Amino acid sequence: MPEAPPLLLAAVLLGLVLLVVLLLLLRHWGWGLCLIGWNEFILQPIHNLLMGDTKEQRILNHVLQHAEPGNAQSVLEAIDTYCEQKEWAMNVGDKKGKIVDAVIQEHQPSVLLELGAYCGYSAVRMARLLSPGARLITIEINPDCAAITQRMVDFAGVKDKVTLVVGASQDIIPQLKKKYDVDTLDMVFLDHWKDRYLPDTLLLEECGLLRKGTVLLADNVICPGAPDFLAHVRGSSCFECTHYQSFLEYREVVDGLEKAIYKGPGSEAGP
């Protein structure tokens, strides 16, 4: 019996490995997240290798080609169109973005902190609604994403309101008072690693950056989820919580945002 060609054996082996990965994703995440995981961890790296660039660079190039310079709304629409029609990306998106807009307009923060800039979508979205003199500090750990965020912010015409800081949130947060002249924060938008939501919330409080009335708005608390953060803010009398059910960006997968208004450390006391 003739032996199978090595290339064929390699292809079969790779197919089996990918099938196992898909089944594991399906078991732990369900179909919605499974498809996203398959795209992000399997198809996307292959696409990047073939194209010679990254998805984030392709999003920026699409904006530069199709959006109007200095028009923040045009930038958002270009990103949404690209991510709906061509490649999924982890922006807050248009559906949940409207909820973010409403919270910004309701509370009108003067000093806003964003944890996780990615490609700059939410930074542009929030900065365009800030009052004159208000500012947004956005922290991004990935230098490549930070560079794209800066270009996106510049192109959208909101760079005068946005300060981009490259680094890990747990390293930057303790520097905010002295290095970035922050007394307390009016609002914090959490959209970085979900396992950092709770530690960074505790760190913000420890560093004296939360005041009575500070608004925490956390994305993706259902999908992929931030259960420890939700348990903490909902179970603490220091926070007044509101949940906004919505859908995962550019997908019909249930997700939501959690708004937690800080009531002060003294609110914890009880019988």
From Swiss-Prot:
For binding Mg(2+), which residues are annotated in this chain's numbering?
191, 219-220
A GO BP term here is: cellular response to cocaine
Superkingdom classification of source: Eukaryota
Q: Which residues cross the membrane?
A: 7-26
Its Enzyme Commission number(s) read: 2.1.1.6
The outcome of changing residue 72 to S is: Correlated with reduced enzyme activity; associated with increased risk for schizophrenia
Do you know which InterPro entries this protein is assigned to?
Catechol_O-MeTrfase_euk (IPR017128), SAM-dependent_MTases_sf (IPR029063), SAM_O-MeTrfase (IPR002935)
Task: Paste the cofactor note.
Answer: Binds 1 Mg(2+) ion per subunit.
From the UniProt record, list the reaction(s) this protein catalyses. a catechol + S-adenosyl-L-methionine = a guaiacol + S-adenosyl-L-homocysteine + H(+); 2-hydroxyestrone + S-adenosyl-L-methionine = 2-hydroxy-3-methoxy-estrone + S-adenosyl-L-homocysteine + H(+); 4-hydroxyestrone + S-adenosyl-L-methionine = 4-methoxyestrone + S-adenosyl-L-homocysteine + H(+); 2-hydroxyestrone + S-adenosyl-L-methionine = 2-methoxyestrone + S-adenosyl-L-homocysteine + H(+)
State which tissues express it: Brain, liver, placenta, lymphocytes and erythrocytes.
EC top class, in one word?
A: transferase
Molecular function as annotated in GO: catechol O-methyltransferase activity; magnesium ion binding; methyltransferase activity; O-methyltransferase activity
Q: Which cofactor does it need?
A: Mg(2+)
Family, similarity comment: Belongs to the class I-like SAM-binding methyltransferase superfamily. Cation-dependent O-methyltransferase family.
Q: What does this protein do?
A: Catalyzes the O-methylation, and thereby the inactivation, of catecholamine neurotransmitters and catechol hormones. Also shortens the biological half-lives of certain neuroactive drugs, like L-DOPA, alpha-methyl DOPA and isoproterenol.
Q: What is this protein called?
A: Catechol O-methyltransferase
Q: What is the lineage of its organism?
A: Eukaryota, Metazoa, Chordata, Craniata, Vertebrata
